UniProtKB/Swiss-Prot annotation:
One of its GO terms (cellular component) is extracellular region. It comes from Arabidopsis thaliana. Gene3D superfamilies: 2.60.40.2310, 3.50.30.30, Peptidase S8 propeptide/proteinase inhibitor I9, Peptidase S8/S53 domain. CDD domains: PA_subtilisin_like (cd02120), Peptidases_S8_3 (cd04852). The gene is SBT3.9. This is Subtilisin-like protease SBT3.9. Residues 1-25 form the signal peptide.
Length: 756
């Protein structure tokens, strides 16, 4: 799992070239989840955890050796080193909701905010109306922070909010009294879960700081994207020059380091969430996720997020980087806001001029001098032009020349290294779009598609002495560059809860320019361009900060609804949004959820699909949680209704029907947050072959009526099993268009897998 700055799909973003080397411990770490706290006193909560372990292990010494963390603020539970049989024994205790094995999570700019319309240019802009996020606190759970970055300076900041109960922890090369300020108001680190599971990290192989300081830069990049201060004249290898800032430059940032050398222990992440809830964050941002989709009740971040959301804290989290394959989406709990990644209207065209005077525009992040004209070669037998064979079969014909190769799969750094080691001067790589550009000032590496690669190959074979010139990359932005869902972005449908649409929303996550640790191999003056849903997540978190500033009384689900129902389904220029992959197609809700985030529209959505904890309880009932389990989660006696509710009635800003056979009726409720006296009419764009009827077709709101419910009757005309078809349901008052995606699959034969 060792990759570097190609930003490949294995990580949510690639930030360092490491291989974890741990000493394997005998016992494993398990999280014993007990639900809502029974005591307000944290010490009493911890004592109850010790007593439970004592009943199993038999001595105080064994308890102290076993316990890793006590979760005692946002919820109750503990992490402990247990054998498999001990974990089974403790899971059978009546007060235990779930015993969850420890999981390793992977860590998944100047132009971004202007592209989305979040500009400080006028007094009526979202940024100005929200006072740039001032007095809001965002918690970032990631790999730490590089506090010296100017993006975290506190010039112009007032006092830290009085409600803040957190603080800063000193550690290796991190002095709390020096490195924290009125902007960076919190910094803590959590590593005990990782160490308890795998032993002490080998810091010779995996350099790290035992403190909140960020070694690799992932967390620094994320935090500065959310709320970095204004910093003029920033560029990256001379490209993308402009004023760098986060989405909410006035926000207070609290950093919780739970990720080490690219990996995050679930026990550590859960402890970070517990502390953040206690400290008083208003929003949580997590650019991380499991390598495979997990059920919410066995997934650490989902457990922590449930309690955060129940306390009014929105949780924004990455969709994952396992795309473009279907059903790869992770972080699928209905109470979190799951973010996919798109490109933005910026690219870096790089001119390739052949000896026949034909110029091809590839893509690169190359800030070096012009190269050429020099020789151009295509490695024939035994390489057959395959990029992946270059390193295994060094070829002397590459010396002093630019090499053309074709990549059948996601390319690796080995191809670039092979050309450099053979004395090559540059590399032109024909491949499927992966948004994996290596920044460089010395060695030009240019990406093109297979069609353009074939054109170059024809030229090479048409002349005895092919030559080529490669110019430095340029920055191009505006309507001539279309928006696409990134190839790496994980896709729906949701394999864990198919009736819950995931992702929820998309945001720019390709070549995002933000602050970085100087240790990073891609650092250029304290900044770097990175790609991944890790980078898209803080873009959405920044918007959530601004919405929270303007609407402090809105619930997490209200904020999610406002974002989803106002999203662009075309890009800001009005052009269609495509989804990159092995073949390019028009994007659909499984690629981008409600669409591309539209911050200015989200401020005034008109109507919202709101939810409370009671709605999530109905979800738990619908997916067969027991009354006892739900009661433990909530800390109060709860009985599911009989008959059990339908998951289709969960008041989400989307409708997803995975197994339609005949007809189904579902319900939604909307709350008016726009003009008091409003009349909305429904507009239906049904999926192909699907009939959709809404009753009533008109919703009237006034001073006494702020909520209205409606039913949606859905039936199919298909006579065979189909794939998903997509449409939309929109309420409009001619000023607001409140749109939700509709996704329907007909299943005449139930639970049938068709390989044809």
């Amino acid at each position: 799992m060792s990759k570097t700055i190609l930003f490949l799909a294995l990580f949510l973003s690639i930030v360092l070239n490491v291989q974890i080397s741990f000493v394997v411990a005998e016992s494993k770490v398990y999280v014993v989840y007990l639900g809502e706290k029974e005591h307000d006193n944290p010490e009493s909560v911890t004592e109850s955890h010790h007593q439970m372990l004592w009943s199993l292990l038999g001595s105080k010494e064994a308890v102290l050796d076993s316990i890793v963390y006590s979760y005692r603020h946002g919820f109750s539970g503990f992490a402990a080193k247990l054998t498999e049989s001990q974990a089974q024994q403790i899971s059978e205790l009546p007060e235990v909701v779930q015993v969850i094995p420890n999981t390793l999570y992977e860590m998944t700019t100047t132009r971004t905010w202007d592209y989305l319309g979040v500009s400080p240019g006028n007094s009526d802009s979202l940024l100005q109306k929200a006072n740039m996020g001032y007095n809001v606190i965002v918690g970032v759970i990631d790999s730490g922070v590089w506090p010296e970055s100017e993006m975290f300076n506190d010039k112009g900041f007032g006092p830290i909010p009085s409600r803040w109960k957190g603080g800063c922890e000193s550690g290796e090369l991190f002095n709390a009294s020096i490195h924290c300020n009125r902007k960076l108001i919190g910094a803590k680190y959590f590593v005990d879960g990782l160490v308890a599971e795998f032993g002490v990290v080998n810091r010779t192989q995996n350099p790290e700081y035992l403190s909140p300081r960020d070694f690799a830069g992932h967390g620094t990049h994320v935090a500065s994207t959310i709320g970095g201060s204004f910093l003029p004249n920033v560029s990256y290898v001379g490209l993308g020059r402009g004023t760098a800032r986060g989405g909410a430059p006035g926000v207070h940032i609290a950093v919780y380091k739970a990720c080490w050398s690219g990996y995050c222990s679930g026990a550590d992440v859960l402890k970070a969430m517990d502390e953040a809830i206690h400290d008083g964050v208003d929003i949580l941002s997590l650019s991380l996720g499991p390598s495979v989709p997990l059920f919410p009740e066995t997934e650490h971040t989902s457990v922590g997020a449930f309690h955060a959301v129940a306390k009014g804290i929105p949780v924004v989290i990455a969709a994952g980087n396992a795309g473009p394959t279907a059903q790869t989406i992770s972080n699928v709990a209905p109470w979190v806001l799951t973010v996919a990644a798109t490109t933005q209207d910026r690219s870096f065209p790089t001119a390739i001029t052949l000896g026949n005077n034909i110029t091809i525009l590839g893509q690169a992040i190359y800030g070096g001098p012009e190269l050429g004209f020099v020789g151009l070669t295509y490695p024939e037998s035994p390489l057959s032009g395959d990029c992946e064979k270059l390193s295994a079969n060094p070829n002397s014909t590459m010396e002093g020349k630019v090499v053309l190769c074709f990549a059948a799969s996601t390319p690796s750094n080995a191809a670039i290294a092979a050309v450099i080691n053979a004395g090559g001067l540059g590399l032109i790589m024909a491949k499927n779009p992966t948004h994996s550009l290596t920044p460089t000032r010395k060695f030009p590496w240019v990406s093109i598609d297979f069609e353009l690669g074939t054109d170059i190959l024809f030229y090479i074979r048409s002349t005895r002495s092919p030559i080529v010139k490669i110019q430095a990359s340029k920055t191009l932005f505006g309507q001539s560059v279309s928006t696409k869902v990134a190839t790496f972005s994980s896709r729906g449908p949701n394999s864990v809860s198919p009736a819950i649409l995931k992702p929820d929303i998309a945001a720019p996550g390709v070549n995002i320019l933000a602050a970085i640790s100087p240790n990073s191999s891609i650092n250029d003056g304290g900044f770097a361009m990175m790609s991944g849903t890790s980078m898209a997540t803080p873009v959405v978190s920044g918007v959530v900060v601004l919405l929270k500033s303007l609407h402090p009384d809105w619930s997490p689900s209200a904020i999610k609804s406002a974002i989803v129902t106002t999203a662009w389904r075309t890009d800001p220029s009005g052009e269609p949004i495509f989804a990159d992959g092995s073949s390019r197609k028009l994007a659909d809700p499984f690629d981008y959820g409600g669409g591309l985030i539209n911050p200015e529209k989200a401020v005034k959505p008109g109507l919202i699909y709101d939810m409370t904890t009671d709605d999530y309880v109905m979800y738990m009932c619908s997916v067969d949680y027991s009354d006892i389990s739900i009661s433990r989660v909530l800390g109060k006696i709860t009985v599911c209704p009989n008959p059990k509710p339908s998951v289709l009635d969960l008041n989400l800003p989307s409708i997803t029907i995975p197994n339609l056979r005949g007809e189904v009726t579902l319900t939604r409720t909307v709350t008016n947050v726009g003009p008091v006296n409003s009349v909305y009419k429904v507009v239906i764009d049904p999926p192909t072959g699907i009939n959709v009827a809404v009753t009533p077709a008109e919703l009237v709101f006034d001073y006494t009526t702020t909520k209205r419910s409606f039913t949606v009757r859905v039936s199919t005309t298909h006579k065979v099993n189909t794939g998903y078809y997509f449409g939309s349901l929109t309420w409009t008052d001619n000023m607001h268009n409140v749109a939700i995606p509709v996704s329907v699959r007909t299943q005449i034969l139930q639970r049938y897998y068709d390989e044809n």
